[in-house]
Amino acid sequence: MVQDETVEQNWYEDDNEGEVGYSFKEYDVTSTPNDFNTKTIIDFIESGLFKIPGFQRNYVWDIKRASKLIESLIIGLPIPQVFLYEEGKNNYLVVDGQQRLLTIYFFSKKRFPKKDKRFELRQIFEENGKFPDEYLYNDDYFDDFKLKLNDTTILEKNKLHGINYATLGEFKNSFDLRTIRNIMIKQNFPSDDDSAMFEIFNRLNSPKLSSFYTLHFNFFRICF
């Protein structure tokens, strides 16, 4: 157990030590934009249409950062687009945007993963394609997800602070129907590998990767 926790802590590092190397290669890639609302995204995650590939890191956001994303969606501010790689028909791997997608999913379930359980939860998700209810509603693994937001001014409290998905009230439709841009990527050439997925991930994320995670990503790319 101590070993797992040590590994998990390394996944949270956030330094700028080096970039992942790559070889020069030309690609033929089709990129298709799609705007999905949050309810559709939640359905896609639950049905296994959106998958988290093995080279992705754990869920690392804290409750404050997660709450700011949900607040942005509710009040109508744009958030960064999500990149998805088409591995097969109705089968998409999340290249960039895992933290945002899982935050939306967790909020809809009114549950937030405990930091010391995220390494184990990652394995559970990979094995099941989702978070089974026996874990999702187990207080040993998850806390209640209530928005944790700062007051808007000294004299005015943030009206969204402390609420969860069930208590959104007048804001529920705003959250449920808010659309997020998703870029669906399909590699046409080369046709014998998925290397475009790794290159896109590398170029979007390499400045944010820890030295531990860079080694993990390189190993996964070589093996697969």
Each model region followed by its residue ranges:
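Short Pro/Gly-enriched beta-strand edge/turn motifs at strand-loop
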Residues: 47-52, 63-65
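N- or domain-start disorder-to-order transition segments that initiate the globular core
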Residues: 16-49
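Basic- and aromatic-enriched surface patches that contact anionic nucleotides/nucleic acids
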Residues: 4-7, 12, 24-32, 55-60, ...
